[in-house]
Amino acid sequence: MYGVLQVVMRDTSLLDGLTKEDCVSISGVIEHRDEETYNPKIPTGTIELEAHSVEVLGRVYKQVPFEIMTSKETREDVRLKYRYLDLRNKKVKDNMIFRSQVISFLRQKMTEMGFLEIQTPILCASSPEGARDYIVPSRKFKGKFYALPQAPQQYKQLLMVAGFDKYFQIAPCFRDEDARADRSPGEFYQLDFEMSFATQEDVFKVGEEVLSATFEKFAPEGSVVTQAPYPIISYKQAMLEFGTDKPDLRNPLRIIDLT
């Protein structure tokens, strides 16, 4: 069984010699909890382990660099240096679990819509887009280099030529560019898809259906989710009215030409 289980130690001598964050193996007897101590938030919330013996599997010899449960209050550079400890913080761990659930749902949704998931190559020829390439030297061919893909653009178009009329993948993209507010520097993942003989409206429809279903499923309880169909505005209208190509339509302010 994997997960969280409450342990009760009636023999406090079992704690002798233990230090905080030691990794231990505990043997004992599974018992029912008292009803007033039930925890409905976890699958094991009605049982507990009465410890009979404790074996230290991995001892902590140095003080951990920060308190695990409050790691989000620690300086970011320290958290990143000890990322494996930071990920033990429940709030941080929940982010990883949430990401996994969203990706799993996206795969399910795209498959239901008739798309085929295909992984395209990571080591490829350079095809510059909007940023600099990450270059990987070839061991076999001296003086030659691979590039990490900024996007799987060429490969997915070749898949259309090959007769795979609906493709998708959760694609890793590598771009040597500065950090942005909505993605980390260097690499990010995107839902990438392509369809043969599709119109702009066909692409909008797929995107709208996937986004709508995803937000509907994962939006926090009680939050307001914008229902499809979503408003569509042209690039020209966005620039003239908002001064940006990705406006926040919740903002009621508009640019008005009075000349």
How should these model regions be labeled?
Residues 1-259:
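Class II aminoacyl-tRNA synthetase catalytic cores and aaRS-like
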